[in-house]
C-alpha cells in the first residue's frame, strides 16, 4: 500500500532528525506526493500527521516540529492539524511588498522563535505555488533558521518539505509554476505499481 510506504518514509526521516545531535546532521528530505483528485493525497497527509503525533509524541503542531500550510484558507482548513495559509505562516500578508525581515528586528526575532522547532513543512495544493512564492518561502525559512548551528544557506533553511498536490490542477495566480505540469500529465495516468519502484 503506497499510503503506508509514504508514511514509513517520512516517519523514518523524522526519527533520524530527532536522534541527530544538531539540525545539520541529517540532510533535509524533499518529497512530492502527487496524484489526481480523489486519490487520497490529503487523507495520506492527515494519516501521516496522526501517526507523527502518536508515534513520536509531538503534541500540538502549532509552533512545533511540523508546520502545515496551503496557498488558500480553504485548502488549509481541509487538512486541519493547525494548518494555515502560506501567507500567514511566512508573514507575506502584503502580496506585492515582500521584503526580508530586518536583522535584529523584533519581527525577525518573533518569527525565528515561532519557527525554532520546525523541522518539517508540508505544503498542500502545491500546483498553486509558483516560483516567486517558493522563493519567498525559502527566503523566510532561511531567515528563520539562520544560526551558527545551521547557516541557513540551504534551500528552505534546511527544513524538510513535503509538497502535496495535483500538478494538472489550478496553476499559480500571477506567477509561474515552479515545475512543468506537462511533464506530469503522463505520469499521473500510469498505474501506481509502475511509478513506485
Go through each PLM region and give its residues.
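Conserved ATP-binding/catalytic motifs of P-loop helicase motor domains
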Residues: 1-197
Amino acid at each position: 500500500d503506497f499510503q503506508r510506504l509514504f508514511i514509513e518514509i517520512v516517519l523514518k526521516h523524522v526519527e533520524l532528525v530527532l536522534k541527530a545531535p544538531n539540525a545539520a546532521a541529517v540532510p533535509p528530505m524533499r518529497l512530492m506526493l502527487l496524484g489526481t483528485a480523489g486519490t487520497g493525497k490529503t487523507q495520506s497527509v492527515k494519516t501521516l500527521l496522526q501517526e507523527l503525533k502518536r508515534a513520536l509524541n509531538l503534541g500540538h503542531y502549532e509552533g512545533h516540529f511540523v508546520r502545515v500550510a496551503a496557498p488558500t484558507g480553504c485548502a488549509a482548513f481541509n487538512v486541519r492539524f493547525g494548518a494555515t495559509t502560506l501567507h500567514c505562516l511566512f508573514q507575506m500578508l502584503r502580496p506585492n511588498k515582500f521584503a526580508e525581515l530586518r536583522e535584529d528586528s523584533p519581527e525577525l526575532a518573533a518569527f525565528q522563535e515561532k519557527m525554532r522547532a520546525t523541522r518539517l513543512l508540508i505544503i498542500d495544493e502545491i500546483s498553486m505555488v509558483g516560483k516567486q512564492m517558493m522563493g519567498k518561502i525559502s527566503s523566510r525559512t532561511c531567515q528563520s533558521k539562520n544560526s551558527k548551528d545551521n547557516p541557513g544557506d540551504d534551500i528552505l533553511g534546511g527544513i524538510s518539505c513535503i509538497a502535496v498536490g495535483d500538478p494538472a490542477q489550478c496553476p499559480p495566480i500571477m506567477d509561474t509554476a515552479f515545475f512543468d505540469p506537462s511533464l506530469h500529465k503522463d505520469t499521473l495516468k500510469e498505474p501506481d505499481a509502475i511509478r513506485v519502484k
